[in-house]
Amino acid sequence: MQPRKTPDLGCRNIDLSPIHASLKEIHAKYRDDFSGNVATYIPELAKADPSLFGVALVTADGQVYEIGDANHLFTMQSISKPFVYGFALEDHGVDHVLSKVGVEPSGEAFNSIVLDERHNRPFNPMVNAGAIATTALIKGKGHDQRLARLLGKFSDLAGRSLEIDHGVYISERATGHRNRAIGYLELNFGMIEEPVNEHLDLYFEQCSILVSARDLAVMAATLANNGINPLTGQCALDERYVQNVLSIMHSCGMYDYAGEWSYRIGLPAKSGVGGGILAVLPGQFGVGTFSAPLDDQGNSWRGIRVCEELSERFKLHMLKSRSAAGVVVRCSYRGNAMRSKRRRSSSEDEILNRRGATICVFELQGTLFFGTMERVLRRITEEMATFSYLILDLKRVLQADECSAALLSQTAAMLNQQQKILLLTHCPEHFGNSGETINHERFADIDCALEWCEDQLLQQEQPEWLRGGRQIPLPAMDILQGFDPSEIALIETILLEKRYHAGQIIIREGDSA
């Protein structure tokens, strides 16, 4: 098997990302929960280790987050069905495929022999009858060429070369009597054509393809990215049919749990009895999970819990209204390139020119939700090693949901652990509408925040007599630089000392000189 090639997106501190931390927290919550039972109707599946548990999330632009046993290999099983449906659409187009396989939920078990007698076709491509009919549509000259096409297409989706677990394939082939009955029943009614045994072998083989939770997340991210694999940049599925695939996943992808899944979690998804679940948030990311113990509906028990937590925590329901992501970081710069309006002495200027780059400013814009915040957090973790103070300006942020407030609060805590300070400007007391208070440095605008950061840097380097509001000796004043001691002493005799209380106005712009 070829090694995976993940693009270098520059995020060197991925473990510090609040998104990675959230995935880690969710994984830890269910790691020791062994509810459910491993599938046993296929002998090879019964050998699965119930303790293995992996979670991966891949964004539509290729950032990979993975936790636990995310690289453990298992067989796709029914997760292969929506993709083969997409391949059939590429081969024949929508109208022809619809004439052979419907798109309506059946209300029956995934291995039901019940067919749509009115239209003389299986109800949908997610039940076994529909999946067998879909596989029968895959073009190629003979079994070997058709199998090579399927493996090649799945490898394009995963961004690496995939293989078949021949032990599982042989086990499925030896025990797949019900599927054989379905195949020959479909042949009898003219739903599929010969060679039936070849179609069935291909179906058993596609279900036996080895993948990991990470692979599933990449495949899901490919669907989220309109069919373009975000790791390789290769088109793995024609963009015209991505919507069709996601639609059938949304309505029929989770067996008898499909309706409740749509109601509670709201993401197009597909599960398999091998323990995998794949879920997609179009335009944003894909999720892959693996845990072999299944619930009563045949879905991974831990996988369902992970997706529920992610959807609730990050407000991911597909029907939740949100604006397009766009560019969220309007501009960024450092404190040595953009200074506050506060006038400084030449010695202070020298310090700030030298150390000002440790002040980092991000001006944000648009709508903040999971997809846009992930990009902001990635930028933060990429640059974190080079700054001590981070200013996030929210002046141009139009809307922010609860997820963005929670992620920002976690970011502040993470930066604090790294001995760095987060400053927010133009930020409401309660960020978003969640009531989650982000208890960190707040300022009215960027200039005030820059001045505060500059003061911190100056306090770290200035002489002791400049700290704590102490009086500056005359020789240290910029205006007297170049004068010798006798001249300074003479000037001191003619100066008049005046004292002002804190907050007292010394001079106003426009006053007479």
Question: What residues fall within each predicted segment?
Answer:
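Cyclic nucleotide-binding regulatory module and flanking cytosolic helices
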Residues: 19, 451-509
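Active-site SXXK
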Residues: 61-62, 75-97, 219, 287
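A short, well-structured edge-of-sheet supersecondary motif
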Residues: 31-67, 276-279
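Structured C-terminal helix/loop/strand segments within mature extracytoplasmic catalytic/sensor domains
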Residues: 3-7, 12, 226-257, 262-333
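Short acidic-hydrophobic, aromatic-tinged amphipathic segments that line or gate anion-handling sites
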Residues: 439-448, 452
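Glycine- and acidic-residue-biased ligand/ion/polar-headgroup-sensing regions
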Residues: 81, 503, 511-513
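Active-site-adjacent helix/loop patches that line small-molecule binding or acyl-intermediate pockets
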Residues: 3-35, 88-206, 222
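The feature marks cytosolic C-terminal regulatory regions of anion transporters and related permeases
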Residues: 317-413, 417, 423-427
